[in-house]
Amino acid sequence: MRIFAGIIFTACCHLLRAFTITAPKDLYVVEYGSNVTMECRFPVERELDLLALVVYWEKEDEQVIQFVAGEEDLKPQHSNFRGRASLPKDQLLKGNAALQITDVKLQDAGVYCCIISYGGADYKRITLKVNAPYRKINQRISVDPATSEHELICQAEGYPEAEVIWTNSDHQPVSGKRSVTTSRTEGMLLNVTSSLRVNATANDVFYCTFWRSQPGQNHTAELIIPELPATHPPQNRTHWVLLGSILLFLIVVSTVLLFLRKQVRMLDVEKCGVEDTSSKNRNDTQFEET
């Protein structure tokens, strides 16, 4: 803020009270990941002399934009705003030192100071708030086989913290065992997971609502208890598997028996052939002796 103090001191010394800058809005509320343009207007009587214009945008102790000698000086710019903050020159020519920030982060929230020197000096403070609605709600339903209870789970990311409210199809609060866990993402968003254990039947409807006090910031997901899968198909499959195993066993046994029977027959034939040969040899011997 040394620059700010120097400009104000210069203005006071020269008593240039006629130079006044205006801010159409002193509060901007934007969504995480969106773009924002914060306006800071100053008087331009004739054609703007860019070389005589000095503009500073600061956020607390962080340098956001520095415009001197007719161009932006990025050297002192804080790393948090590198590549995301700019001061459109076409707006400067209209007397509007508009600060544009793209892909707004949670850490961008805070109080900004617009300081302008152009024949005189003045400043304005502008507040930026960042919200991240819990729009994308992931859900899951599971059944505890031991207790037959259904566990309903809703998970979403956002900022600031939201309360998770569970209701039934009549939008009445639901009693049951609940738990909530909260963690931080890399982008500093809050990762909120809420679970509810209830006794329910198929087609029962439940709602989980990520509730915040601001209007239009509430988001709801619907969970419908699914029907239990039919038990017949698994039993039928078991029967078919068992029957197939039995048939395969019988085929293998039959094949083995046929093979063994064939081997026995071949042995019998070979045995008969040997016996016939032996008998013939004996008969030939007896004939020779005679």
From Swiss-Prot:
Residue stretches making up the Ig-like V-type domain: 19-127
Record domain Ig-like C2-type: where: 133-224
Annotated phenotype, changing F67A: Abolishes the binding to PDCD1. Costimulates proliferation and IFNG production of T-cells
Gene3D superfamilies assigned to the protein according to its UniProt record, in alphabetical order: Immunoglobulins
Localization per Swiss-Prot or TrEMBL: Cell membrane; Early endosome membrane; Recycling endosome membrane
Listed result of changing I115A: Abolishes the binding to PDCD1
Similarity comment: family membership: Belongs to the immunoglobulin superfamily. BTN/MOG family.
The protein, known as: Programmed cell death 1 ligand 1
Origin species: Mus musculus
